[in-house]
């Protein structure tokens, strides 16, 4: 698609093809109350000095409070924290009530059981269209060793679960759990005894192996689901 006028929905979907981590940005308002919201446009910037960056929509709740704060924190959610992401993506009045959290050295809320957290001083706020880029200088951080939650094409996924599934299939058997729909009738994939097809996985990508075997059976295989919606 060319030109600089795009269908916003199509552009958003294209951006969404890039898998990201899921974070909750937090800070305190002038009265000391915690504020925060979910964001996935996050990246490291520099080791020396230690800088990171997060993009915030100008329509975000608490946008003014967040961008005016002297300090803010980034909570990188772990694989088990999909519910936290959903809570902080919604306009709930007291989102912090359902989360186990504490104050970082400069007072920013940090969550328990996250993959990592960073508390930052505000280094710069850069205008960028309908967003701003908040650049933070890291003043404190901690990494728990837990795996981070992933997000792509509108769905959450757990990288370690996907890796274990691929690893398990690589040395054993893989199978199809699906049905075909033809003229409003459903047909299980399998033999006449209605068992599901299974194939030996000697190595390589299990999904590609399964697709190849099914195509040999005369089936057209496309649109493989690559995300695990937990």
Swiss-Prot record:
Species of the source: Rhizobium meliloti (strain 1021)
Primary role: Reductase involved in the catabolism of stachydrine (L-proline betaine), a source of carbon and nitrogen. Part of a Rieske-type oxygenase system that catalyzes the demethylation of stachydrine to produce N-methyl-L-proline (monomethylproline). This subunit is probably involved in the transfer of electrons from NAD(P)H to the catalytic subunit Stc2.
Official protein name in the record: Stachydrine N-demethylase reductase subunit Stc3
Assembly information from the UniProt record: The system is probably composed of an oxygenase subunit (Stc2) and two reductase subunits (Stc3 and Stc4).
Similarity-based family: Belongs to the non-flavoprotein flavin reductase family.
Enzyme's top EC category: oxidoreductase
InterPro entries in the record: Flavin_Rdtase-like_dom, NADH-dep_flavin_reductase, Split_barrel_FMN-bd
Keywords assigned: Oxidoreductase, Plasmid
Any one Pfam family match given in the protein's UniProt record, by short name: Flavin_Reduct
EC number: 1.5.1.-
A molecular function (GO) term: riboflavin reductase (NADPH) activity
């Amino acid at each position: 698609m060319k030109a600089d006028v795009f269908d916003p929905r199509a552009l958003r979907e294209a951006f969404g093809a890039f898998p990201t981590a899921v974070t909750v940005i937090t800070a305190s308002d002038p009265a000391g109350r915690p504020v925060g919201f979910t964001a996935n446009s996050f990246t490291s910037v520099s080791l020396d000095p230690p800088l990171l960056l997060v993009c915030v929509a100008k329509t975000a709740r608490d946008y003014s409070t967040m961008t005016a704060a002297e300090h803010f924190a980034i909570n990188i959610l772990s694989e088990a924290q999909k519910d936290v992401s959903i809570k902080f993506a919604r306009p709930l009045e007291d989102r912090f009530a359902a989360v186990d959290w504490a104050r970082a050295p400069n007072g920013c809320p940090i969550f328990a059981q996250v993959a990592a957290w960073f508390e930052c001083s505000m280094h710069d706020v850069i205008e960028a269209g309908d967003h701003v880029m908040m650049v933070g200088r890291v003043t404190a951080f901690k990494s728990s060793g837990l795996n981070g939650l992933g997000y792509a094409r509108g769905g959450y996924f757990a990288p370690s679960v996907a890796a274990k599934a691929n690893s398990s299939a690589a040395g054993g058997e893989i199978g199809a759990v699906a049905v075909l729909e033809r003229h409003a009738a459903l047909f299980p994939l399998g033999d006449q005894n209605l068992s599901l097809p299974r194939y030996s996985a000697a190595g390589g990508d299990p999904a590609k192996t399964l697709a190849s075997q099914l195509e040999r059976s005369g089936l057209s295989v496309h649109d493989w689901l690559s995300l695990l919606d937990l």
